[in-house]
Amino acid sequence: MTPEQHFILSLLSPMKTFPMVIPGHLRARIDRYRILRAQAGEDLNLSDIVRQALTLFAYARPVSWPTAEMDGQGKAVNVKLPSVVIEHVEGLAGFYNETKSDIARAAIVWFLDQEERGQHEPNRIAQ
C-alpha cells in the first residue's frame, strides 16, 4: 500500500476532537471563503472548512507555510478530525516547538492561500 493510499484509508477512522483557537482576522478570512463557497452552492460551516484545510495540509505535506498571528480576538473551537490529521499536526508542533494551534492556524492560512490561487486540487498543490 502506498503512503497516499494509507493516508486516504486512515481518513475513514473515527474522528477525534481537536481544540484550537482561531484569531479574529483568520475567522473573517474563513467567513469570506465560506460565503464564496455558498455562492457556488457549497454550504460549509467553520468546522467543515477547518477540517478540509487541515486534511489537505496533512496530505500535501508542504515544506513551508505561512504563519497566522493571534490578534487578541481569538475564539476557541472544537473540530472533529481524523486521527491521522491530528497526529500530523502534533508531529509538526513537536518538531518545530510550536503549539498545535499554531500549526493548525498556519494550515488554514496555507489552505486559504491555495484556494485563492485556485490551486486546491492535490495534484496542483504538490507542484
Predicted segments — roles?
Residues 2-25, 59-85:
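Short Lys/Arg-rich basic patches
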Residues 8-12, 23-48, 83-102, 106:
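Surface-exposed, Lys/Arg-rich phosphate-binding patches that contact polyanionic backbones
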Residues 3-10, 36, 113-117:
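Long, compositionally biased, charged low-complexity segments
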Residues 19-21, 26, 34-37, 54-57, ...:
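Generic hydrophobic/packing signal
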Residues 42-67, 100-123:
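Short, basic amphipathic alpha-helical segments that act as recognition/interaction helices
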Residues 40, 71-73, 93, 117:
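Feature targets compositionally biased, intrinsically disordered low-complexity regions
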Residues 1, 120-127:
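Short intrinsically disordered terminal tails
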